[in-house]
Amino acid sequence: MLIKQFSRRPKNMKVQILLAFAALFVLAVGSYASESKKLDLRDASFSAMFSADYQLNPQERGCRYFLGECKKTSECCEHLACHDKHKWCAWDWTIGK
């Protein structure tokens, strides 16, 4: 009788350990998926914020305003320059009329 109890325990313990690892795996996958959705939403809102100037025609307004998309500095308004890396109009550190 004592031998039967010890022979059952390791099987039961193996099942418990397996269930614990399975639960940790499910939690890890769920956490990763949740974080991935947050990052995707953040990236989408960030890119939408800076690409919103496509709705305005540059010929109608004459120049591109602050953080507007550009290819060269001549497209940007006064006191703005086209940023080399990000390709948007940024302040060129000049002041005056």
Swiss-Prot record:
It comes from Cyriopagopus hainanus (Chinese bird spider). Coiled coil: none annotated. Ion channel inhibitor. GO terms for cellular component: extracellular region. Residues 34-61 form a propeptide. GO terms for molecular function: ion channel inhibitor activity; toxin activity. Belongs to the neurotoxin 10 (Hwtx-1) family. 12 (Hntx-12) subfamily. Transmembrane segments: none annotated. Disulfide bonds join 63-77, 70-82, 76-89. Its main location: secreted. Keywords: Disulfide bond, Ion channel impairing toxin, Knottin, Secreted, Signal, Toxin. Residues 1-33 form the signal peptide. This is U6-theraphotoxin-Hhn1a 2. It is found in: Secreted. The presence of a 'disulfide through disulfide knot' structurally defines this protein as a knottin. The keyword rRNA-binding does not apply. Pfam families: Toxin_12 (PF07740). Expressed by the venom gland.
